């Protein structure tokens, strides 16, 4: 696509004087030419001030700036909420914003974002090939790829009659119910292969703060499960709920108890309909379709 990388590494910018910061940014932008457009992925996990200075410097080259918002730190951590005005100031320097969802767009506009051109990302791509040793089949099983301690999965499902596969390390000094199994950390390719065997992929949190952020952000887990070829189970408030429902990618529920009931009463024919729908988006995710379309749309909308 004719896009070159401008590499930014994470460091403590408080150690830089204003002149040192200018020199650092000049070095990062050494390959730029007048009129070049820049896609800036935010946050860079340095500081809002660094992002402001960086974008201001880019604009001196008389090109346009697309800010691709990967995450919004003031929404992720309660301790960072005070930084929201700083990040809104960063975003308002853009000629175009790429945001995770319609919900995120509405939220940022409500918080003061004034950029007129905004594009919705919707899904992360998973351009990874993996081995498919068998056909995906109906299993009364929920798979969860993530921190059990952070998301509270086993505690909520410990009395359930559904099998739960958690891709996290088994906790020490804890009695594990018979329906809960910990598989530890596995690499992405192995994870996709194992998920492909069947059942459902779970995107969930019992932590209300995290659940609220899921209403706005793009969960990488959604794409992981869809790329693996299995339907997903998520809360009705998830940011991509409309996509899931419209495309028959999985089950949207209010509670995990409701999810277990739906799964246990599902026929193999019903499950196969989900598999047929998911297989289409799995192919697109594996070929970077969403990212390519997103970037082309953004460039042409500038």
Predicted regions and their residues:
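Alpha-helix capping/helix-boundary segments
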Residues: 103-105, 149, 239-240, 258
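Nucleotide-sugar-dependent
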Residues: 189-228, 234-242
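A charged, aromatic-enriched C-terminal amphipathic alpha-helix characteristic of glycosyltransferases
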Residues: 254-261, 268-302
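N-terminal subdomain of nucleotide-sugar transferases
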Residues: 1-12, 158-159
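Donor nucleotide-sugar binding/catalytic pocket of nucleotide-sugar-dependent glycosyltransferases
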Residues: 95-109, 113-130
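A short acidic/histidine/glycine-rich donor-binding loop in glycosyltransferase catalytic cores
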Residues: 247-253
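Extended catalytic core of nucleotide-activated donor transferases of GT-like folds
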Residues: 16-106
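Conserved catalytic-core segment of nucleotide-activated headgroup transferases in glycan assembly
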Residues: 126-194
């Amino acid at each position: 696509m004719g896009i070159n990388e401008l590499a930014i590494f994470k460091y403590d910018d408080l150690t830089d004087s204003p002149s040192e910061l200018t020199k650092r940014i000049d070095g990062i932008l050494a390959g730029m030419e007048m009129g070049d457009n820049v896609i800036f992925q935010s946050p860079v996990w340095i500081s809002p001030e660094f992002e402001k200075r960086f974008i201001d410097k880019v604009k001196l080259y008389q090109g346009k700036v697309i800010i691709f918002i990967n995450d919004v730190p003031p929404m992720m951590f309660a301790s960072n909420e005070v930084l929201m005005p700083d990040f809104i100031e960063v975003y308002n320097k853009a000629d175009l914003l790429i945001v995770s969802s319609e919900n995120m767009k509405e939220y940022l506009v409500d918080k003061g974002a004034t950029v007129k051109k905004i594009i919705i990302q919707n899904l992360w791509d998973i351009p990874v090939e993996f081995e498919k040793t068998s056909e995906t089949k109906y299993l009364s099983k929920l798979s969860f790829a993530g921190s059990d301690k952070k998301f509270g999965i086993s505690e909520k499902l410990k009395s359930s009659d559904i099998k739960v596969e958690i891709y996290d390390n088994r906790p020490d000094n804890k009695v594990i119910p018979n329906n809960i199994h910990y598989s530890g950390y596995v690499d992405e390719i192995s994870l996709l292969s194992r998920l492909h065997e069947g059942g459902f992929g779970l995107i969930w949190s019992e932590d209300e703060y995290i659940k609220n952020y899921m209403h706005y952000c793009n969960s990488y887990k959604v794409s992981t499960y869809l790329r693996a070829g299995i339907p997903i189970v998520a809360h009705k408030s998830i940011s991509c709920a409309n996509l899931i429902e419209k495309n028959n990618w999985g089950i949207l529920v209010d509670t995990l108890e409701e999810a277990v009931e739906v799964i246990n009463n599902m026929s193999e024919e019903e499950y196969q309909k989900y598999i047929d729908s998911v297989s289409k988006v799995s192919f697109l995710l594996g070929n970077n379709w969403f990212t390519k379309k997103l970037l082309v749309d953004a460039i042409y909308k500038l």
